[in-house]
Structures are given as structure tokens and as C-alpha cells.
Amino acid sequence: MGKIIGIDLGTTNSCVAVMDGDKPRVIENAEGERTTPSIIAYTNDNETLVGQPAKRQAVTNPKNTLFAIKRLIGRRFEDQEVQRDVAIMPFEITKADNGDAWVSVKGEKMAPPQISAEVLKKMKKTAEDFLGETVTEAVITVPAYFNDAQRQATKDAGRIAGLEVKRIINEPTAAALAYGLDKGKGNQTIAVYDLGGGTFDLSIIEIDEVGGEKTFEVLATNGDTHLGGEDFDNRVINYLVDEFKKEQGVDLRNDPLAMQRLKEAGEKAKIELSSAQQTDVNLPYITADATGPKHLNIKLTRAKLEALVEDLVARSMEPVKVALSDAGLSVSEINDVILVGGQTRMPLVQQKVAEFFGKEPRRDVNPDEAVAIGAAVQGGVLAGDVKDVLLLDVTPLSLGIETMGGVMTTLIEKNTTIPTKKSQVFSTAEDNQSAVTIHVLQGERKQASANKSLGQFNLEGINPAPRGMPQIEVTFDIDADGIIHVSAKDKGTGKEQKITIKASSGLSDEEIQQMVRDAEANAEADRKFEELVQARNQADHLVHSTRKQLAEVGEKLSAEDKAPIESAVNELETAAKGEDKTEIDAKVQALIQVSEKLLQASQQQAQADAGAQQSQSTKGGDDVVDAEFEEVKDK
């Protein structure tokens, strides 16, 4: 059985880890970095770039460089949060036929799971390069507050990337695993404050040690799936745009190139202000008008940054209060606070968390790597490599069905430990009703329409009877991934209908299979592209070395020996500019064959040069003069 890798699929950055012996290990990518930007770019020559290479070219290709895709995964185009992103993202967010939020790249509509799969493929390849074997299984993390549609979409992304997702686990829970695995402190209750690039979670987790077995039990979780570092960046960008408009009278919002440069500069300034009190944002030639080029140079202080984002930090504290209340705990009962996610490096965030909990957060957890490490530990548990660890997670949102009057009747309360199963008996609302529609909902509101619709199905063939007489048993079953299965059974006839909840939108199995095939086809195209580049490089090297030899020893060849070599060099040079690898290989072989006499002449010249050098050194050896020396001792 191969290794089960752990992947933190982040909004801004992603990370992959694996159990190396009995210790989890974060794996460096091809660029030598421990985290990979969750950025995907589609270039003009149909190449797909992922990670740092995609980030580097973002300024010149803003419309086809996709980032923060996790904010769209499993969401409807009409969602308020998606509409906010539509207004600020440089790439085009569009409405899919099923109502989902998709992205349009070069006129082609793409689903968020399809795009996220590119990042997962990069993580898979990173792990394979390290392990030296094929990887087919993974544990992938999601924000604790992700709903069913978002979890399903993340699983779909894994399938498209060629991974069997063995488990979806919540990010704060994974961080707790990373923190608590080697802590021999017995029982303790911790709060995990996870403020990442696009999402925020707060989980209260109890770590118990009984007879050598560690149990990680989530008591409560809460969060905001549209609050994170990207929102902090946008505040900085908007401030810079407004200041520039005041100074220069030019609105940069209409210039995608300038906005992409501002995004990079804004993120860099925000990071610098975690350690410095002020920074300069300096972008020469940001734009131009009739009077000439314009330069942006704005000072940004830490105090100004904190004023810009104060309400975002305050917004993160609301779910903290709710989670504590749901867990039935007071602040004083929390033993440790762990910070996860890059945005928690901001001093204001650390200060507000410390003020709320009345204690300094822990500094011994890497906020960028803890989640991937925890996922790798869970992978080790599933593979049987890690013993004596039990993970008890919860469902973040209540689940129920719509009943008469448009009310949501809850079957499974939020923060119920999963996996779980719950049944309840309902009846008909009309006389002689022969079918019922089971409308499955997720959320905390009593009004059904105010909650997230997860899907609906019909139970037909109910025997005619007065209203309220038939007994229909509805059963909710949530698996360890937090994925929901619902069944409805007519106790009178024994007829039963079951579904695994597919988001009321979501991707169909056919669409996922097509995307898997596309991904495999792309992998083949990528392999061919790599082979073509290698062939071109070999051709360039051969052209260069042959021309060098011609310049050095060409006069020793006759004109009839020299002409075919020069002709073959020119033909190879032309072939190397084309797209046909077979032709390049053929021209390489042709040049090697006609260059035989040139190679001989070159070798003869090298031998002659070596002989001359040796005789010179022998001659020089006769001139060696013996010198007398006197040893001087320290007095």
C-alpha cells in the first residue's frame, strides 16, 4: 500500500506533507519552497503554469491568471460573497449552466474544482518526486465551516487530479493534530484560531490522553468562509488606488495591469508591516496619460494598515464567541490558543486574540505548515502507520428538511460529532397524498428559504390515506468526511428512496469523468511539451558546439567535407524552431553523421595542443632552481 499524503489546499498557498517514518514531514516543491502559491495561469502558447511560475507572470497576464479560487468552490454565482469577488477580481467570474460560479479563461468556462485540481496535481507531483513512487491517495483539508457543497467540490477536485480522497478533514482539527501529537501534557482544551488567505475558522478542541491513546475531540466550531488575507489585501489596494487618484487624478481600477502590480505591492506591504512600523509602496510607471508617465509612491504605516482592517479583525471575533458558547466553556477554561494561517502573523490579530483569551497564543506552531502536517498524520492513521490517535470531528452546520409552512425542521444539530446517524418520522400534509418531496437544508435559520439548499428528492407510491396518517421515516447519515447521505422510507409500504447529497448545483459524475480525461490528456500534452523542450535544448547545444569546432579547426577540412556540415547545422537550427520533435531528432542524427571528419580534426587538434603543453612543462622543469633556506626559531 502506497503512502497517503496530506494536502492543505489553501486559498493563497498550498502545502503537502507525508509521514516519514514516525514523523510528519513537509515536502519542498520543485522550486525549493515548502509552500506553493495557489495560483494557476494559462499562457498564450497553451501552457498551464502552477505556483511560483504562475505568480511571476501575473502582472503581464492578469485576465488568465487565477487565484483565490477556493473562495468560489461549491458556490452559486448569485451568492453575495461571489458577487463581491466579481467586482474586484481581474479574471472573469461567470455563471455556469447549473447556476454555479465558474471562471472564464480565453472564452472557455472552467469549474473551480477543475482549476483547483491543477494545484492538487502539483502537490501530488511534489510528493511523488520526494517519495520516488506513484501517489494515488490523499487526505485533503477544508475550512471547518465549509458546507456540504464546498466539501463535495473539494473531493471532486481531488478526483480530477487523479487522487482518491481518503478523508476530508477540517483545517483547525488538522492543526490541533500537528500541535498535540508530540505534547505529553495529558488532557487539555485548546482553541485553534485559523485565519487563512480566504477563510476563517475557530474550533474548540479537547485533547485527552487515556491509556496511551490520544483523542482529539472537536467540541464546537464556527467561522466565516469569506474572510481572510485576500480581504486584508483588498483594503490596502483600495487605499493605494484612492490615494493615487487624489494625487494624480487617475483611477487605476480600469487598468488590469496596474491593478495586478498593486495587488503584489499591497500584499508585500502588508507582510512588511508585520515587522516594520512603516513601508514605502513604490511603483514607477504605474500608468500614463497625456502629460506623460505616472509613478506611484505612497507611504503606508502600520497604524494606517490597522485602521484599514480593524473591522475585519473584529469580525473574526464573533465566531470565536459563538464557538465558546456552543462548547459551553468560558475563556478561562481554554489552556492554549493556536494561531494558524498566514494572516495570523499580523501583530493586530495576535493582540486581539491575546486580549480576548487573556493569554498569549502559542508560538511553536508554524501557521503555514501545521494544517498539512495534521493532514499527513491523519493519512498515517488511515494507513495504519500512526497508532493510538483518534479524531472526533463535528458537523459545522445544522441539517434538516423543509416541513409545512416553509419551516426548517432540524434532525442533526450543529457541532454533532461525526460520523453520525439520526432518524425522525414525518407525515403527509394533504389527504390521499401519494408522494412527498424531501428538501434537504443546511443552516441555522428557522425559515427554510434562508438556509443553504443541499438538494431534494421524491418518495413516491405512498398509499392513499388521510393527512397525518402515513409514517415516513427520514434518516440523515453523515460520514467521516462530513458528506451527507439521506434516505426516506414509507413505513406502511416499505418503499425507500436514498441519495447521497449532491449539491443542488455541483458537477455531475459525467462532468467529473470528462475533466479527469482532460487532465490526463493535458498530462500527456505536458509530457510531449517537456520532451520537445529537451530536444530543442539538445539541438541548440549541438549547433553551438559544431559551429565552435568549425571556427577552430574548419580550415583543416576540404570544402566538400565542410559544406554538408554547415548545411546540416542550418537545417537543425531551423527544425529546432518548429514544433516537430521527430524532425529535430532526425536532424540531430544527420548532423552527428556528417560531422565525423570534423570531430576527428577536433580530436587531433586537442591531442596536438596537449602534446605541446606537456613538452613546454618538461622544458620548464629544467629551469628549477634549488634554494637554501634557514629555519628561524621564535626566541
Curated annotation (Swiss-Prot):
GO molecular function: ATP binding; ATP-dependent protein folding chaperone; unfolded protein binding
Gene3D superfamilies: 1.20.1270.10, 3.30.420.40, Actin, Chain A, domain 4, Substrate Binding Domain Of DNAk, Chain A, domain 1
Top-level taxon: Bacteria
Feature: compositional bias, Low complexity: 600-617
InterPro entries cross-referenced by the UniProt entry: ATPase_NBD, Chaperone_DnaK, Heat_shock_70_CS, HSP70_C_sf, HSP70_peptide-bd_sf, Hsp_70_fam
Any one Pfam family match given in the protein's UniProt record, by short name: HSP70
Region (Disordered): 600-635
Induction conditions: By stress conditions e.g. heat shock.
Residues that bear Phosphothreonine: 199
Keyword annotations of the record: ATP-binding, Chaperone, Nucleotide-binding, Phosphoprotein, Stress response
Homology family: Belongs to the heat shock protein 70 family.
Role description: Acts as a chaperone.
HAMAP family: DnaK
Protein name: Chaperone protein DnaK
UniProt organism field: Histophilus somni (strain 129Pt) (Haemophilus somnus)
Lineage, opening ranks: Bacteria, Pseudomonadati, Pseudomonadota, Gammaproteobacteria, Pasteurellales
Gene: dnaK
